[in-house]
Every structure is written in structure tokens, then in C-alpha cells.
From Swiss-Prot:
Pfam family, one: Rng_hyd_C
Stored SUPFAM superfamilies: FAD/NAD(P)-binding domain
Phylogenetic lineage: Bacteria, Bacillati, Actinomycetota, Actinomycetes, Mycobacteriales
Name recorded for this polypeptide: Rifampicin monooxygenase
Coiled-coil intervals: none
EC class of the enzyme, as a word: oxidoreductase
Reaction it catalyzes: rifampicin + NADPH + O2 = rifampicin para-naphthoquinone carboxamide + NADP(+) + H2O + H(+); rifampicin + NADH + O2 = rifampicin para-naphthoquinone carboxamide + NAD(+) + H2O + H(+)
Names of the cofactor(s): FAD
Residues in the signal sequence: none
UniProt keyword annotations, A-Z: FAD, Flavoprotein, Monooxygenase, Nucleotide-binding, Oxidoreductase
Amino acid sequence: MSDVIIVGAGPTGLMLAGELRLQGVDVVVVDKDEEPTQFVRALGIHVRSIEIMEQRGLLDKFLAHGRKYPLGGFFAGISKPAPAHLDTAHGYVLGIPQPEIDRILAEHATEVGADIQRGKRVVAIRQDTDNVAAELSDGTTLHARYLVGCDGGRSTVRKLRSTSVFPASRTSADTLIGEMDVTMPADELAAVVAEIRETHKRFGVGPAGNGAFRVVVPAAEVADGRATPTTLDDIKQQLLAIAGTDFGVHSPRWLSRFGDATRLADDYRRDRVFLAGDAAHIHPPMGGQGLNLGVQDAFNLGWKLAAEINGWAPVGLLDTYESERRPVAADVLDNTRAQAELISTAAGPQAVRRLISELMEFEDVKRYLTEKITAISIRYDFGEGDDLLGRRLRNIALTRGNLYDLMRSGRGLLLDQGGQLSVDGWSDRADHIVDTSTELEAPAVLLRPDGHVAWIGDAQAELDTQLSTWFGRSARDRA
């Protein structure tokens, strides 16, 4: 029997597998596909996800296979330069196709001991007070203490949960998308696309790597369902209707369509079954937030689930996964809905778009929207206190090295600039680092394994209270 079954070997599931294995949790990942998908659902990662990869020592691998791009233009495609200053060492978006992201995360998960089994579909889920069982399409059954559905927007796990609710907003527009070859010369193509995008923001034809082009074009009508596959002829017809040319598209690698509806699961946990990533929330791909949202779900859930399995989680810790992450997803759904409205060709939304564009001339407005899209403005509600409380702490330089290099183990961390504090009683769960930084005013900060600030201060009694809140009873009390 495993500790955790993860259903879905995409970025969310693979990130979660790596996080759990860092804490010694026995993990099996199952995925319905025989081979890793080459379907490029996402093209890069934003600032907070870049920081997460750095916290786990994976960033160099991502940088080796990606390309840095400026952060401007990520809110509804409004072309404005990035803010002059962001509270991060990584003020860029890293362009890297999802298959490459999946490959790096799968290699990491395997290296730390995760068992990844492909070509196995979950067909039934049963759970009792102690365990959960997943019946697979090959007739076998896996048993574990917990199961996490990371199997995408059409999640089987979500559907198999009893009385699961996944309400949807109304779809008002559909978009066709795919990767294929084109014959139109590059200069001519760029000129045509630039002209069309003056009025059609849901339109694009551009390089996707490996000689292919990604084509995005409004669909002729909203589909009643997603059962009918998109064809190359569908895309050609819409290109001709909107651009007056089909760009000579041919040899599609993959084709799909998406709508602008949003959906958010009514709960992220049903006893021993959790949802993460697109299984819990879906939205239009505005601002490139979807993959990042799922990776950050996994980063939040991983250490908490490991704490429960390893026997030191305080009461209610697992419940904070939903209370922290669901509001974040709701905010992403809101901002993608807003962006979807702003790319409409109707006169009203276009007037609002022009107004937003004017407002983005103000540095504070531009920074606010950029921090929202890149997820570095997230602040979990830990109660009243310093503005840093509940936020992630960016990588800061220390006298000896830097902060994120000290977080690769996935443990909690007390950064103590005065050297007067102690984590005695919690040293099996949190590291105590005595060091100083010119970039941090607080005398000491307690960081959760996901890098969010759980406490700021210099009083040992207050620190002990927060250590108990996030890391359970001290070893002295458990003895």
C-alpha cells in the first residue's frame, strides 16, 4: 500500500509527487496516457513558479531549456512595458513548452523516488475512514492513505467523488487552437497577423518551436459540447473568414478548442480524496496562469499532506489547503473573465480596454496587475500583523549564500538575524539558520516549507506558538 496515489502526470501531479517524496512519503502516480503528451497546453511559467523551482533546486534545468521574455503585455494582451520594479529576482516570464516542463518535473519526481505508471486509467474510487482504493483499467487496485486528482479539467477523480459539484459560467465564445506548419513567408505572415490583431485579440499565428506554428482563431460558433473534434478545415475556414488567407496551414501536430467559461469545484477535499490544478478549477487561458496555478496548488498541498502522513500535522492543517488555495483560484477566474471581456470586438468592451490601457500608464496600476498575473501578490490570511505575514518571501541575499538555497529540503525554516531564538523541539521539521541580510528588516522570520511567512518577531514564546500552529506539537510534548 502506498501513502498517496496521484492521478495525473501533468505539471501539478508531478510537482506534488516531488514534494511528497522530499518528505519520505511513498507515492505512486498513474496517468491514462501511454506516453507523455506532446500537446502544448502552456508555453511558460511566471515569476512565482520560477521562484518555486529555484526553492527546490530545479531552476537551472528550466533555464537551460527555456527563454526569458519581458513581462509586459500579459494582461489581456495590452501592450505595456513591465513595471520598473517587482519584488523578485526573476522579473521575466520563462518561455518553455509544457512537454519540456513535464519532462523536467517527471525526471525530478523519479530521481527522488516517485513511482510513475502510465497507460492506467482510474475507473472507480472507494474510501473508508482509514484508506482509499483506486480501481484501474487494467483490473488492478491501488490502495493508499490519500488520493489526489491532478487529472485536468475533465477530471475522472472529480467525477467519481460522490455528489461532486463543478458549476460552470456560461460560455460566450469559443476559440480554435492548434500547432501546424505554414507556407506563408515569415515577413508576410507577421504583417498580416499584426493587422488582424488590431481588432481581433483572440487571433494569433506565431512560432511554437520545432518549426511549427501555433494558430489561435475565434471559432464560428459556440460548441454544444467538446465531443466533436476540431479539424484542420475548421481552422482554415476561420482563418479565411477573419484574415482573408489560411496562411498555407498544413500538417497539424494537434488541434483543439476552448471556451471562455470558468469552473471552480465546490470543495477541494472530500475526506481522503483531494483535487488540485485544473481538476479543481478551469478558466480561459488568459495571462498564462493555468499551469502556474496548478503547480502552486501542489506546492501548498505537498508539505501539508506529508505532515499528516508523517504524524506531526497540527489539527486542521490539511483543511488550510482549501481555505488558502480556493480563494486564489477564484481570483484567477475573476481576472481571466475580465480579460476575456477586454478582448471582445464589441464597442463597449473595447472602450473599457482603452481606459484600462490608459490606466496602465501609471506604474502602480501596471505593478498591481503584473503582481496578480505572476502570483507574487498572494497573501494568505494568517491574521493581523506585518504586511509580509502570509506572503511568500522572495529570494534574498544572506551573508553566507542566499535564502532559497536553504529551502531545497522542503522543511520549515527560521531565519534568525539576532541568533537569540531556537526551534528546539521542532528541529526534525524546521531548520534554524542564524544569518543576516541587508534586504530584511525583521529580526527573525519563520517560513513554512512553501516559503510563506508564518511569523515575524523576536520573542521565543510567540515563535513557539507559531511553530505549534504550523508544525504541530514539539518533540518534548510528544515524548
